[in-house]
């Protein structure tokens, strides 16, 4: 069996080290930096010939820099005769640009990135909670899309929730919320229906379901600026919700996210470590992080040993 080796770019160094620790190994020796003009510089400083290589790199902000690091590392390893290269992308950037809405003149950038990764020699992709699962079909190589929900669910069960109800922040997240509700002792579910009555009128949030006197668990795949999430929490509290917890896999936290969360009525925001948090976000008392290192380490081990990934999520 080929030697398994882990390498990491600069996007998620702490997560990469945690994964390596879980696998009782060390990260491979690679110098990933910049030339004086800002171009990505990569040098692999150990033998990888015939190896089973895993590159751990989220394509989070700065998205283009991290994506280029990943593809240049793949090229360097391919030219060094690596046997198989798996791109471990905990957070897959550009995933929200996955279709042309109403035939608008816009790119399908998720497909562009998929083609880019395939063209440089990626043999397989391992990612977490793709924004749209059909993005797997954009790739010409196998894609394992694993789920953060078991880690989030395990934490939810420790909260001592009082008469809980799972809330989807929009119509598109109903399938995710329903799955969590079923696993959370088959609890009830509510949906927030956001709509604008007419142009230039503020968005109105209609809550489908009874949340009065209950602990609400908002679930989503990602939190970006947090603006919509915070407004959803306000709407739930106005409808009599007792406490509001927000769970998401990917903590993008861009723009005014820190201020939004600091001033929100959300009791706690729980996210995973697919994207590093800024110091400002880390300082917020209502934000907590869970690690996916154990799950990703197990997925990497299974891929390397040609074992089933789906078996990890069978209940």
Swiss-Prot record:
InterPro entries: PRib_PP_synth_CS, Pribosyltran_N, PRibTrfase_dom, PRTase-like, Rib-P_diPkinase, Rib-P_diPkinase_bac. The gene is prs. It is an enzyme of class 2 (transferase). Pathway: Metabolic intermediate biosynthesis; 5-phospho-alpha-D-ribose 1-diphosphate biosynthesis; 5-phospho-alpha-D-ribose 1-diphosphate from D-ribose 5-phosphate (route I): step 1/1. Activated by inorganic phosphate. In addition to form a complex with ATP, Mg(2+) also acts as a cofactor. Strongly inhibited by ADP (or Mg-ADP) through competitive binding at the activation site and at a specific allosteric site. Competitively inhibited by Ca(2+). GO terms for cellular component: cytoplasm; ribose phosphate diphosphokinase complex. This is Ribose-phosphate pyrophosphokinase. Transmembrane segments: none annotated.
